[in-house]
Amino acid sequence: MKGGLGNIMKQAQKMQEDMQKAQEEIAAMEVSGEAGAGMVKVTMTGRNEVRKVEIDPSLFEDDREMVEDLVAAAVNDAVQKVQRESQERMSGMAEGMGLPPGMKLPF
């Protein structure tokens, strides 16, 4: 019984370390979202911090409302990519821990 508890504690500690590492990797990653066939690009971190906005110069000849809509769409695209990447990394970790498919980790 004593050895079993020690094993459980070691597994819990490793799981905590793995989760922290995955969260750090997610925070450090960068993704780019696009809209308007790539005419507007937004780069953001895994923490949803926008790092860069690129707008094709030809868009400035068009109306402002369209540019604003494309920027919003590119930001939303980048946010979705961060969420998708985070879910993929965390579900991979859950499978490595022997959790059933579809079981979500507590975050």
UniProtKB/Swiss-Prot annotation:
Q: Where in the cell is it found?
A: Cytoplasm, Nucleoid
Q: Predominant location of this chain? A: cytoplasm
Give UniProt keywords alphabetically. Answer: Cytoplasm, DNA-binding
Region labeled Disordered — which residues?
Answer: 1-24, 82-107
Q: Pfam families recorded for this chain?
A: YbaB_DNA_bd
Task: Write down the SUPFAM superfamilies for this protein, in alphabetical order.
Answer: YbaB-like
**Which InterPro entries has this protein been placed in?**
YbaB-like_sf, YbaB/EbfC
Q: Does the keyword DNA-binding apply?
A: yes
- Classification via Gene3D superfamilies: Nucleoid-associated protein YbaB-like domain
Summary of subunit composition and partner proteins:
Homodimer.
Q: Which PANTHER family match?
A: NUCLEOID-ASSOCIATED PROTEIN YBAB
| Entry function | Binds to DNA and alters its conformation. May be involved in regulation of gene expression, nucleoid organization and DNA protection.
Please give the family membership noted in the entry: Belongs to the YbaB/EbfC family.
Q: What is this protein called?
A: Nucleoid-associated protein Hhal_0231
